[in-house]
């Protein structure tokens, strides 16, 4: 139920019908309810800055024209007081209803209406920063009720489906998306300042290469063929490095036809960069510089408290230290130490090694879905043994070749690759490696991936002969790096769910 100026309670549907009737009546009588334009002379921020210069009651001589949305209204004696918002700022607009023509307009206006006003800035007797309106008009009437900021939106489904309503009344939500833009801007500036070129690559591909993930399939009517929505821009970006663009990056959407949970959404935003003449050691240093510098820039400190809210229920807080250097964990060394194994890169591809790993999974109570490939079994053990240790930013490095089909062999550790993942709060944020640039080795890796794919591993990569051909022209020694922006935003904005940092997350139809 909602209450209006007449103090009569109306249901949402009754309010809608009444409001539609009022607007239609005004339009029928020739009133312009949806004007094309309203010329603004001052933003709310500029008006408030001018008012701040005087701390006593006053009405200025300057005339301002501005506009915003009515978020609350009250009638007191002959005056109607509107709290109007614009771009996150709030301003009181005072209308003297006894002045000619204003009483009828004041009666028509409702909470949620977008209005334009002209008047003099000043302060009321209670010293409230205000504009004393000489004219106020409707720019867009609001036909439906908007929840009050006090009660807010409780239902997550409504929040995600009607983000516009969430943004109207939830200051925390607006701030979170502003910080998201700040984070993306910081990454872009960081790379631009180091000579990287921002590029765009196709989102529809013949082969879904670049990551171990299940793709979405679409169909191109004109070409009469199925295409895959990209799971990563990696292979295209490396082709650009082959073409002589030695430092490139792309910020954009990826699509993975997988599960939805607190930290996964099928459509997500990533940044990937590729840097000729760099290796994964250089990228670890750059990652520390980027992430630690970003946190320092946003919060003025390298230590923050991640305190997520699940709606009104606050979950346990976690202190995260981004102080350099970050902790480093070598995968096989840690698995051996924690599980009492004797794994080595040279023997990882043996059948008895897989049996040892499956036995370790059984002892730890872990179930591995078929097909039980070496990559899947190792991934399960890493998730169980290593990832829970990675609360503060931690590099997990030197992945086995079976887990890293596009990464270069480790220069001193047989069977391993020069790859790392950065974990924060036990979740992967970054993935990077010294790029495999040997076309002979790359073909062999793709062949193994094809075998895994045929065995039922729907996350294995397809063979990309065009990419191998590009490698034959010569990919310089290159470091490649990717970051999941949505997860990073979660941890820097106290979001409990990845859907809280995506304007319009993937949802089932109502």
Swiss-Prot record:
Location, primary (coarse class): cytoplasm
Enzyme class of the recorded protein, top EC level: ligase
This protein's record includes keyword Glycoprotein: no
Superkingdom in the source lineage: Eukaryota
Molecular function via GO: ATP binding; lysine-tRNA ligase activity; tRNA binding
One GO BP: lysyl-tRNA aminoacylation
Pfam family, one: tRNA_anti-codon
A cellular component term, taken from the record's GO annotations: cytosol
Keywords: Aminoacyl-tRNA synthetase, ATP-binding, Cytoplasm, Ligase, Nucleotide-binding, Protein biosynthesis
Localization annotation: Cytoplasm
Catalytic activity: tRNA(Lys) + L-lysine + ATP = L-lysyl-tRNA(Lys) + AMP + diphosphate
Cross-referenced InterPro entries: Aa-tRNA-synt_II, aa-tRNA-synth_II, aa-tRNA-synth_II/BPL/LPL, Lys-tRNA-ligase_II, Lys-tRNA-ligase_II_bac/euk, Lys-tRNA-ligase_II_N, Lys-tRNA-synth_II_C, NA-bd_OB-fold
Enzyme Commission code(s) on record: 6.1.1.6
PANTHER family: LYSINE--TRNA LIGASE (PTHR42918:SF9), LYSYL-TRNA SYNTHETASE (PTHR42918)
UniProt subunit comment: Homodimer.
Family statement drawn from the similarity comment of this UniProt entry: Belongs to the class-II aminoacyl-tRNA synthetase family.
Protein name: Probable lysine--tRNA ligase, cytoplasmic
Record organism: Encephalitozoon cuniculi (strain GB-M1) (Microsporidian parasite)
